[in-house]
Amino acid sequence: MDSKDFTQLNLEEHSYKVNREKLPIDSYIQYGGFTYANFTPYIIHGDDGFGEHKQLNWTNKLLWNKLGKLNIKDTQILMQNNISEEQHNELISLEAQKIARENLADRINYLQNINTSIDFKLWKMNKENLERQELLLRQINELKEEIKSLKNIPSTVAIIPTNTYTINMIRTETEDWKYFKYIEKELVQNKTEAIAKILDNSYIINDNLGLLYERYEEINPTPKPYKRPETIFDTPQYAKYIRNQKRQEEYEKQQELKKENENKEYQEFLEWKEKQQKDKGKGIQTVYPTLIIPDIKPEKQKKEDMMLEMIKNLQNELEQLKIQRHKEHEKQAELTKIQMLEEELEEELDPDNLEKEVLNNIQNIQISSDISESSEINEISDNETEQISGSDSDYNNEQINVKIEGEEYEYKDNYRYYKPQPPYYKKDIRRERQYKGQSSQRADYIKNRREQFESTYQANMNTTINDSGEILNLDCTTPEEAEDRIQKWTQSMSIALVKQQLSNEQAKQFIRRTFIGNVKEWYKNLTNEAKQKLEGNAPLLSLTHMELGLRAEFGKLGIESDVEKHEKKTSIARHKILQLQICSMDHQNLNAYLCEFQEYYYSANYTEAESENILNMFYSKLPEPWGQQVLNGYLSEIKGKNLLDSIGARMTYLQEFISDKCKENWTQKQARKIQLSKNLDCSYYEVGKYGCKQIRPHKRKRYYKKYIPIKRKYFNKKRYKKYYRPKKFLKRKNPHKACKCYNCGEEGHISPNCKKPKKKTRINNLEALEFKNTEMENLEFETNKNDIIWVEEIEVIQPLHYEEEEKYKGNYSDRILQNPYYINSISIEELDNLDWEFEYQEDIEDDLEYQNFVYQESNDNWYSDQENWYSDEQYLGIYMFIGETSGENNQDNMEGIIKEYNKTEPEKINKIIFTSEKFKQIMENDLNMTKDKIFHNNKLKKLFGKKEIEYYIVTDIEHPIDVKYVQNQDKIINLPLYNQEIFENEIQKIPDKDQNKIRNIHLAAVEIVVKAYFREGIDTPFEIILCDDRITYPQEGSLVEVLIGNLIYQKVKFTKIINYSISIEDKNLDKSLVMYWNLEGIKMIKDSKIFSIRLRNLYVLSNKHIVKNKKQYNGNIIIEPIFQDVIQNNNRNYIEYGKPGKFDRTKLKSYSRRFNEPLRLDDRTNIQREKDQIEKADHNLELQKELNNLNYYSQQGQSSNVLDIPKILKIENTKNNYKQFHIIGKITEGRLNKFYPILIDTGAADSYISSKILEDEKLVSNKLSKVVTSYNADNEKHIYDRNTEVIIELIDKNNEKYKINFIGLVDQLRLLEGGKAEILLGMNILQNLKPYCITDDYLEINLGFRCIKINRIKKDIFEIREDLQQMNVLNE
């Protein structure tokens, strides 16, 4: 934008108070700290990249303020230490008033930044002018150097006259000095004449060079270097060639060092600035001297010297700009009174809109008299006329003009209708359809049918507001319409009062004269006290009181407040946006959908977290397959590149997407047959082809005529039948159609003719619908007095006790039927040898069912109605015991874990080691609950199945838990596992015909995975309690499940069978199943995430209440064998588990202590019983090995329910163990030029560099008061500064290199693995790279506004080290 256009820009609409430290990185156009670019009033975005940050570019703000916003008087006031109120009022510029309240240091810094930009521009131009002048002088200096070279010759040989551009001819040595002739000085007009003169004399010099050469040989007979024989010096042509080469080399060097010299250039500018300030303080004025070449007559104005003219033009232009800005400041001083009125209107009106009206429409206002002369509208009493006549002298013969606009405010006494109109008199399509009936004619019928599917939304586009006042008529209006009219009347009157500059008394009369009809009668009937309350001390205050009185009388102010009105509007908008649907992609329907969605979105007032889900819903509501395609395309193509995710961007992408699809289909030959365009209105986006497309009229479909008419006859006594046209007979191979009976499944008859007993319908809808809704939600909830759960110390779980051996004599099936727990003590092969029979007995009186096991050969799975269900990958039977333990190290041996305790402190753990296979199984295990897994056997189908409507829903959701909800809790926090909002969303997805029929929700099962946000191997016992908080008495009835466990694996998983129903109208639905927890053994810093809870809920939406066999399935829980070592359910009965009267947070016992207890007598009996069973199968070698293991553990005194492993001596031999996230970085600072592995940890770990890197390379760091202590492998202590700077070079997927300066990587941390050359980046570094994203394949970080993806190294840490050693060797 040119400088002349500054007057047309309203800076107040764009400028905001900007903190310079919070500006984004690329706010400066070219240089960091200064710029001389052109003015570009564009809005830029903030540092996060999301959300609209209305910050004016700092560069533009500096240029604007320098060129016109601050004058000399304002600058002098701002430079004072203390600014008084009088001086503050004298400030003319609004920008000066904003910064007048700041500190002196901030004001001076602000003024310096303003002067820096324009001064740098002048300095830059002066510097370029000097450079060009130097280029002109450089050629002359080269000529001088040639002349000086001749001066070095002895005087006896050659004589060179001084101060001349011509050279004498060299004479012989015998000639006297007095006979030498000197060429007279010639005045050279310009540079070209001087060069031509020298070239002419060069030939004379070359003729005498021979003499010089001979003389040189006589004086100096020593051998000389190789030179051309005819001359000592080069010819002028050769000298010119050398000069050109030097210039070319200098130009290339300047281009190469241009980028490196940008910061140097800024330093030169600062030095020049300081020098200018010093000279200015001493009273010295810098004068640029004119350029005078010796023996050359300078001209007054040269065409070649463009830089001098440019400087003069710029100086003149700046002077004109300053004069122009000074005039604008004088005009702005005249508008200070109007700005005072703006401050009064801040609470009543929108300041931005009012500013436009005031600044653009202030003119010499002459008030005409239209209302005062109309006696029909203004019927004023005698007292009022006297007051008005008395105040007419103050008006200076000016009159008030009230403008009446719009038919809705038109008032006529002769045509007043008090009878309300029917509700469908307005032209609204949604209301109008209810009164449309089908026409008898087919054309009208088709037209009406088409209108039913047209757009049903019309936006209110009438947004005009009068600036001259309006008549207020509230006759025959509803409270809603009265609110709208009063609001519009208030806005129009406020602008009119400010524009006409009326006094308080004149404003009161002006307001009263706008009342007509019922409003006028209401105001007349008011008492004097009531009228005084409606009046104020200022015109706008009186208008505000009058607005409140009108709203209380005619509107809804007495019924609901503004806050309640806003909340109601928000809730209605949120409810409507969920019900919004679009079924046809016609352009009219699409435009209506966009308009209505936009209105509800802005009225609902969503937060930033909710906004993204709602914006995704904008695409998901489109008909399939367009909704998912558009959403995926937007997320992949636009969202990563666009700086602002808004409705406008999504609307634009949707229109472009439809346009592109229609263009693709148009190029194909059979566009109408393609499935991709069947629901799109491509004619709206196509290029017009008028008259080319044939419009076919509607035709009925022709059907096959079965009968033909007979011939006409004049007279026929008998009425014969019509002629019959038989169809062709097709002979079939099997004339009888094969039918199959639904009851018995046999062919040959149908179910009504079946003779077998009728089959009862158990489940109406076996094909259940699954909706997966994966969302990330932050845990934000509060509790009240009722949301309390008591936790008491729970005894350590002991192995199952079995009855004596005599009770189980007989075959295995009898034993299992008598004791279901006996199945855990036999092997799998013995289970295969059993003769299983399906037995089902039902006692009608007791309503009990015996427990039976069913074996299905087709799927090879075991199922039990009350016990756990496992897939074929899981196993039942005896645990395999391997390895050996060492009592000297005092180790606890768990399944896959070895703990090494300290010798001096037995409770302190020194090292914890895992097996890679065990940990790999844990990490790969995830949520896998499905409806088929829960509702697999017939008994469960009978339990949960219903004849009526049933929809089986599976939802998936994850909650990250903050550390403040675990450590130092003032309140007991719970997590609702079910949410009413989730239920409502799933009900919206089922067919419309069944949505209104859903009345109950049957909670079938919930699968829970708890994942830690810290590394594995930390002994962290925890307790989980599932409760139904709706039950207050009895207390034990609220307990659903109690579990104790340990997060030593980083993950635990279990499934709970809930099996009870709730009503969809229950207001306490969120309390139907909640989770409480207690975790110990670890402490983390504030604002850290300690673990996450992922839920997969299975529930049934039904129209009836499901209550069958509830007692049989109460308390069922599924814990897979891989997690049975780290989590167990409490063996207490729920009736015996009582809550104490007062909540006491007791310390949970460490889960590892149960492994230290000695073997009890019951456990030894169980081992002996298992030995007897294994001895019966001598032919099985594997069982014999298990027998040996049992003998070994019986001697050691260990429990048979504990799985031990041998001690792992070398964990480094473990392969394919890349569970951690590693990338490769190269440290390039100083002597550090090596590749190192970088571990990414998003948990609570701090960032650090291993002591090996710091010790070997000795990084240079800043000295601070706080230091950091680190230990290496030899337990040597090293101290480093806390703010050590390290430059790490990262390589993205496209092999582009990025150098990042990381500060503060070294933290106080004892490196247990000592000496390992590794770098760890924790949350304190990753938070500075927001937004960042970690996937299985790459790490995505944000540098400025650029997204960088870095590949993950999917190798073991030991393999990575070997590869890096080779890379470092090649690098060296």
From Swiss-Prot:
Zinc finger (CCHC-type): 739-756
GO molecular function: nucleic acid binding; zinc ion binding
Disulfide bonds: none
Alphabetical list of SUPFAM superfamilies matching this protein: Retrovirus zinc finger-like domains
GO CC terms, sorted: viral capsid
InterPro entries (UniProt xref): Caulimoviridae_Movement, Peptidase_aspartic_dom_sf, Viral_movement, Znf_CCHC, Znf_CCHC_sf
Protein name: Putative Polyprotein CP
Annotated organism of origin: Cassava vein mosaic virus (CsVMV)
